[in-house]
Structures are given as C-alpha cells and as structure tokens.
Amino acid sequence: MSLVSQARSLGKYFLLLDNLLVVLGFFVVFPLISIRFVDQLGWAAVVVGAALGLRQLIQQGLGIFGGAIADRFGAKPMIVTGMLMRAAGFATMAMADQPWLLWFSCALSALGGTLFDPPRTALVIKLTRPHERGRFYSLLMMQDSAGAVIGALIGSWLLQYDFHFVCWVGAGIFVLAAGWNAWLLPAYRISTVRTPMKEGMMRVLRDRRFLTYVLTLTGYYMLSVQVMLMLPIVVNEIAGSPTAVKWMYAIEAALSLSLLYPLARWSEKRFRLEQRLMAGLLLMTLSLMPVGLATSLQGVFTLICCFYLGSIIAEPARETLSASLADPRARGSYMGFSRLGLALGGALGYTGGGWMYDTGHSMNMPELPWILLGIVGFITLFALYWQFNPRSSAPAVAPGG
C-alpha cells in the first residue's frame, strides 16, 4: 500500500470515530428539546420551533463563511474551535428558563457548527476517491443512525432525572471531540490550492447550476427536519410518554444498519443520482401526508418507517451529488454553501412547522401541517425534475459516479 493510500485509509478511520462523537453529542440533546420545552414546560411549539430554526439558519446559512475560512487556514483550527463553541452552547442550554436564553444557546451551538461542519465535510471529499465516495457516505449515515438512537436513549434516560444532565453530557462529548481533533487531526489543507476567502465564495456564487441545486433542496429539508420537531411531539402525544421517542430512532437505526449500504450499492449501478434523490423524496412526501390522521402508535411508526426508508434512498445520493458538483479548488466554500438549503429549509421547517402544528390544533385540524408539508414535497420534486431533466439540461452524474 502506497503512503498516499495508507494516509487515506487512516484518515477515513479517523473521520468515522470523529463522526460518531459528533452524532452522539448532538442526539443526546436535540431530540429532547421539543419534549422538554413543549411537553414538560408547556411552551408554545412555535417558540421552540423558532429556536431550532434559528440554529439551523445560523449554522447552515453561514456555512459558506466557515468553509471559506477553512479553505484559507485549514481544517484543524476551525474544527476544534467550533466543537468547543458547540459545547458552550449546550452548557448554556442547561440554564434556559426563558425563550431568549434557549435562542441564545441554540445560536451559540449553531456558530460552533458553522465552524466545524464545512471543513469536516470537505475532508470526506479529500480523503475518498470518487468511485468509493457514495459508499463511504452510506457508512457515515449508518453510523449517524446508530449514533442517533444511542444518543436519544442516553438523553431519554438522563431526562428522567434532570434536563441539566442531558445538556452537560452533550457538552462533555463535544469537549472530548475537540480534544480528539486537537491531538490527532493532521494540519490538512482541504482544497487543492490555498484559496483566498473572497475568491472561494465568489467561485461558488458564480456557479449557477450549483446555486439552483442547493436552493431547490430547501423543500427537501423542510420535510427531513420534522424528525426533530413534529414527529417526536406526535409520538409523545399518542404514547403519552417521552420514552416512546427512543423507539422512533431505534426504527431509523435498524433500517439504516440493515438497508442503507446494500441499497446504495444496488442503486448506484442502476440509477442516476438525481433519480435516487427524487425517488426517496417522493416516498418521504407520501409518508408524511397521512401522519395527522394516525391515531395509534403502530400507525405512526409504520409511516415513520416509510419516511426513513425514503431518507435512506435519498441521502447518500444527495451527498454524493453535492460533492460531484463542487469545484475542488474551493471545496470548503462549496460544502459550506451546500448547507444553505438546509439553513432555509430548517428555518422554515422548524418555525413554520411549529406554527402549523399550533394552528392545526387550535383549528381542530391536526392533519393540516402534514398536508402542507406534502405539498412542499411535491413542489420540490417538480423543481428537481425540471433541473435535471435531460431534455432541458445535461444529466448531472452517471450511475456510480
């Protein structure tokens, strides 16, 4: 094995362990926020949704700046600083007894993510070859699912005692992750050239195809973020206990660990990336629309299974497609900007979802938010089809690319 291949192999193992810490730290805390502040403290869902949307908007919306800084100065200092800021945000959340303090803690957590997320994503592109990238994304997502259920289990168990413990454990994991990166992460340059910040950002903003693709994903993310807001609330309402939420993440973990990698291997040889993305989004859309009509835990979990299956189909294709459209001379900037769709979709999905949930209940129409989300899903499908329609533009990436 050549030195380059050995470095790539060791780098991928490092990324897997680093990703596990980040996922654990996040999911110990965030799935419990809506339960803590809406169900336990009685806050309005729109208030908590606004806090979650603010985090999404700041972290992903400012990602291009975090990526551009990493293009200029390298990945390591940005990752370590960002993880320590995320830890500080979680520690502050433990003291949140008023909405402004929850919003502040979410904003601080988001700024940390703005710094560490784009360079970590760019490192995946740097350390993987194009032909293996889709499968490595699948491994990361399998790990995300396992980490999510373990984190949610830990968080649910800690919530029985005190929400302070939930936040402190999450903060501690991010401090550990920061130390891990400070100690072992080499001083990688994530782009092929040391690109000035302004040049990297302008290179992205001039790429109209990439801009269109990223903005189109806003609707996709409006649906996907409901696993952190409305789906846990619905599960908790029907079950009458927050402990049932952990089974929602257990379902995701079981499906991901058993199906994600085989599905990615099978579909990458038969379908284009954009076809896989649209097929997954269609299933997600059809699964969310009937949620408001479900009256049993079995019915809700069946729909959640279908939703997760759609996500399993779509996510590896979405990540690989984003990476394939990025200019290697400004990877950090591209990966940072690619999160803008998540920023807009997250902000609209959380805030709008919270508002729709409150409105639907006040009008005695619990199905209202889910029907509106379904409409958003179909509009997004049409936009993706228009963008990648071979009759109007060249196809994005061939199968296996």
Curated annotation (Swiss-Prot):
InterPro entries: MFS (IPR011701), MFS_dom (IPR020846), MFS_trans_sf (IPR036259), MFS_Transporters (IPR050171), Multidrug-R_MdtH (IPR022855). This is Multidrug resistance protein MdtH. It comes from the Bacteria. The gene is mdtH. The keyword Transmembrane helix applies. PANTHER family: MULTIDRUG RESISTANCE PROTEIN MDTH (PTHR23517:SF2), RESISTANCE PROTEIN MDTM, PUTATIVE-RELATED-RELATED (PTHR23517). One of its GO terms (cellular component) is plasma membrane. Coiled coil: none annotated. The chain crosses the membrane at residues 13-33, 34-54, 99-119, 139-159, 165-185, 214-234, 244-264, 277-297, 340-360, 368-388. Its main location: membrane. Keywords: Cell inner membrane, Cell membrane, Membrane, Transmembrane, Transmembrane helix, Transport. GO terms for molecular function: transmembrane transporter activity. Belongs to the major facilitator superfamily. DHA1 family. MdtH (TC 2.A.1.2.21) subfamily. It is found in: Cell inner membrane. It is a multi-pass membrane protein.
